[in-house]
Amino acid sequence: MSSVQSEGQRKPAIVILDFGSQYSELIARRVRETEVFSVVLGYSTSAEELRALAPRGIILSGGPSSVYADEAPLCDPAIWDLGVPVLGVCYGMQLMVQQLGGQVVAATGKAEYGKAPLKVDDPTALLTNVESGSTMWMSHGDSVEALPDGFLRLAHTANTPEAAIANHKRRLYGVQFHPEVVHSTGGMVMIRNFVYHICGCEPDWTTEAFIDEAVANVRDQVGQKRVLLALSGGVDSSTLAFLLKKAIGDQLTCMFIDQGFMRKGEPEFLMEFFDRKFNIHVEYINARERFIKKLDGITDPEEKRKIIGTEFIRVFEEESRRLGPFDYLVQGTLYPDVIESAGTNVDPKTGERVAVKIKSHHNVGGLPKDLRFKLVEPLRKLFKDEVRKVGRTLGLPEEIVSRHPFPGPGLAIRILGEVTEEKLDCLRDADLIVREEVNAAGLYHDIWQAFAVLLPVRSVGVMGDKRTYAWPIVLRCVSSEDGMTADWSRLPYDLMEVISNRIVNEVKGVNRVVMDITSKPPGTIEWE
């Protein structure tokens, strides 16, 4: 059974078959940007499964393998005879060529990585309105030596004679580059050409349409039963709260567990915003004291995470029993979690899908089985950027919708070493200054994350003609599209100066501010 058939009533217009590319999810996101619903499935998805889904088109992703290798991942050859338009990207194009009778060989001294100008030979169909000379992103070590019968060249580059190919009669197309990445200047034009003009899709994947479908699905699933949501204040759980309130009203109970590791003023803001301003009932659980006691003397970051996660589950269990009974638990599973768990993890030797546990929303995945919740996952079709759009449409304020990612364990993992109340107060004040100044400079929405880290060492300083021996604060600001990779943000010097001066002068116990200029990889965004 195809993993997408459990995704609700809507069937995908475009199916992406994943061959291990780091860009497979990005292809799906780019298709969705054209307001066409797309999903990612494993490359072993059979032609029969695809026929049952009845997509308007299929895209074969790139991948790290060589099509002529013994253990190369291959698609069902019957796919070529479905009569559905197919676009092969990089490895996907090479697979198309190889399976249809062409030849792919290792590039001898002509591998292409990075940007390359595309010379258009046939500006029709896939390449309509794509300017010759447009920059495309190349990443391949193999090349097409001979095209299958019925195929012709659409474009070339200096090192790749067959950079784009087509069999117009069978509506089969291939590109040796990656149109989905931002470096490919004409990439979105090609994707629109394929989706709209070749596949004949309609732009019906809109935020409003999703909300209507999600509301109807939730009402149908839960009926008149009670539903529980663990509210963290992040964009996912906040969007869920608004969506569920719209769908089932007072059947929803939100539980906010304040573990004492949130940023300054956040617990008060959340209660004021949800419970009083928007009349969404929130049960506030003050568990600060029990969490900080559990971390007494703990310095190892993984142990801190484990303790916080375990304690969260215990508190959640206790309070859900007290407030319940509840029939349903809302989880913030997003589409990347669905892809990871069932869609694309395939053993190349057997072709079998390998299940990976879906990430749990806000640490509720380890709840005791005797609580017997049924899961409600209204956002499981969406990528993160789509969740933000839904939140805006539902009326969430920008300060929540555009909130920078914040780890579940909160400030506890931005304090290196042991967590104490004194350090938490110090870090809260420093972190608030960072966010205030980045926002005042108009850079908040241009930066993926901007925050402060407290180090477990002290440094010598001079303040008011007196020697000080206090903590240093690390300023961590990164730019990213999805958090998988990130570059350190080049903040203006005058902004860094303002942040540093304010922290040193206003935050008790700090006498030095340093800047983390490490990208991911090799570093991670968070320090713990």
Curated annotation (Swiss-Prot):
PROSITE patterns: GATASE_TYPE_1 (PS51273), GMPS_ATP_PPASE (PS51553). ATP binds at S232, G233, G234, V235, D236, S237, S238. The keyword Iron-sulfur does not apply. Residues 205-403 form the GMPS ATP-PPase domain. CDD domains: GATase1_GMP_Synthase, GMP_synthase_C. The active site is at C90, H178, E180. The keyword Oxidoreductase does not apply. Pfam families: GATase, GMP_synt_C. Its EC number is 6.3.5.2. GO terms for molecular function: ATP binding; GMP synthase activity. Pathway: Purine metabolism; GMP biosynthesis; GMP from XMP (L-Gln route): step 1/1. Homodimer. This is GMP synthase [glutamine-hydrolyzing].
